[in-house]
Amino acid sequence: MRPINILILSAGTRNKIVQYFKKTLGENGKVIATDMSTIAPAIYEADKYYIVPRITEPGYIDIILDICKKENISGVLSLIDPELSLLAENEEKFKNIGTTVIGSSYELCERALDKMQMFQWLRSHGYNCAKSYVDKNELNRLQLFLYF
């Protein structure tokens, strides 16, 4: 059976998440972590770690793809929101090397980053959620109405 190797991107201070994956995988795989900082404590919990550039740097995805190939990564996930969109946008590249992107579709990642767009989608699909406002004046008018 192929080992289940997981790559956790932008691990930062999320030690418990790295520990959880290590405990769950046990001897059946490894946890590899990345971060742009050598003082990100979670990378030191992993079986192996890589220091990588910022996600906005040119060639970032190619570096991550190289790590996936080198470490025989089964699944890759990020712990920061903007990187989720980046992974989803490049999902086919990961699939082509045998790595599964663990996350939502690009469209859903982008929607989740836009509070008003997410609010409108939730409402249009029948979900109850708190009212959201884009126009500060609209909110002020509502507050005045509620106080009088």
Show where each model-derived region lies.
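Short gly/pro/ser/thr-enriched loop/turn and capping motifs at secondary-structure boundaries
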Residues: T38-P41, E107-R111
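Active-site nucleotide/adenylate-binding loops and adjacent lid/helix of ATP-dependent enzymes
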Residues: C109-F148
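ATP-binding N-terminal substructure of ATP-dependent carboxylate-amine bond-forming enzymes
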Residues: M1-I102
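Residues that form or immediately flank small-molecule/cofactor binding pockets and catalytic motifs
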Residues: M36, R54, Y106, V134-N137
